[in-house]
Amino acid sequence: MLNRFFGPRRAAQIQRAIRNGKITLLCLVMTVVVLRGMIGAGHFGTPEQDLGLIQSHLGNNRRVLEEVKQSSSEGGAAEKEAQTNPNSYEGFDINKILADEEPEEEKDPNKPYSLGPTISDWDEQRAKWLKENPHFPNFIRPNKPRVLLVTGSSPKPCENPVGDHYLLKSIKNKIDYCRLHGIEIFYNLALLDAEMAGFWAKLPLIRKLLLSHPEVEFLWWMDSDAMFTDMAFELPWERYKDYNLVMHGWNEMVYDQKNWIGLNTGSFLLRNGQWALDILDAWAPMGPKGKIREEAGKILTRELKDRPVFEADDQSAMVYLLATQKDKWGDKVYLESAYYLHGYWGILVDRYEEMIENYHPGLGDHRWPLVTHFVGCKPCGKFGDYPVERCLKQMDRAFNFGDNQILQMYGFTHNSLASRRVKRIRNETRNPLEFKDELGLLHPAFKAANLSS
């Protein structure tokens, strides 16, 4: 038909163009179908709905950015509120109330140091007081002296976030032992003499307590980083009837070798009397901080076996005092090694499970140590001598090891030595007094009152 109007050649060109147009149109339709399937047209079936879905997808990124911005803004506002809200502990600067109000009193460097006025008749004064105050006897019953356990820590918070928590565990542990054994306890937070800071702070405190409590027969000093791990062990008081100072140690290491770790002053017993005042006066001169302590440290390092170079400490000074003046003091000093009045944690803590399996409380020695002492961990300081994680984990284990002996009286125990959680180990009963206390800690014989008088 086209040949009639355009001629053969022109008609062929038009027919070819129509065929190409059909192909182009078909390709266009296929492209639209594919694109609609890819962007979700099949979900809704109408262009308007497809457009809405596309817009919603494109808007997500903006929404996320706006939410992050809003969250950041809210977090900043909360932080700002914590810093400005007077009721918030988080934003409070603790240094505002910890700052010392007055400078330390300066001491005369030319004046010899003294713990206090010289007292030479304390035995007579004390005997008179005890006679005039019969309701405060120095012995609760025969072979059971009145004992005051003394411990303490810095008047300021610890220098790390968890130190005070471990101090709390430590004093709770000591309270438990003292309650079971009829021992009084004194916790000190005051630095009584600024010159005797650090290792030496215990000496002025001990002297003051001995003089203020003549009814106390033995004062038991115990460092804050030491814990009781045998709640059932009662000290063999009869063994010490002729001694005035009891420390964990070995005679040969102190008197023969002059080894600076031949004894430990982290846990010791001191009998109240003139002898105690005299040895405190002899012990103290190396303690004043500054040049005296530094120079004394050099002497101790030179004279004592294997001692590192550092300022004078109370333990090294005691070793030096006993080794160089054995004739004066040695007869009244008992170096105890039959049980752990002090037990170095490094050789004990990994054996707790073995002890539980094979032994029982009440032994006090390597089989079930009375005291586990975390020497060098310094849980209240910024840095210790051992990895922090190991120290804290093992302090938790030591606390739980001792605490289990308390909890078992009431039917509970820790899930494990590493766990704060507890579990029930016996069922409740309507006859609770029929329960048999296997360790004998609920009503121990060593706590029974003496009613003979």
Predicted regions, residues:
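GT-A fold catalytic core of metal-dependent nucleotide-sugar glycosyltransferases
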Residues: 2, 192-193, 198-277
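Short, solvent-exposed loop/turn segments at secondary-structure junctions
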Residues: 154-156, 192, 226-227, 251-253, ...
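Short, acidic, metal-binding catalytic loop of nucleotide-sugar glycosyltransferases
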Residues: 168-183
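Beta-strand elements of modular eukaryotic interaction domains
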Residues: 125, 136-140, 174-176, 209-210, ...
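A structural preference for short, hydrophobic beta-strand core positions in alpha/beta folds
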Residues: 185-187
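Short, flexible/disordered intra-domain loops and linkers
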Residues: 155-166, 195-196, 298-309
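Juxtamembrane luminal stem/stalk of type II transmembrane Golgi/ER carbohydrate-processing enzymes
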Residues: 1-166, 383-453
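Catalytic core and acceptor-binding pocket of nucleotide-sugar-dependent glycosyltransferases
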Residues: 24-31, 201-204, 208, 275-452
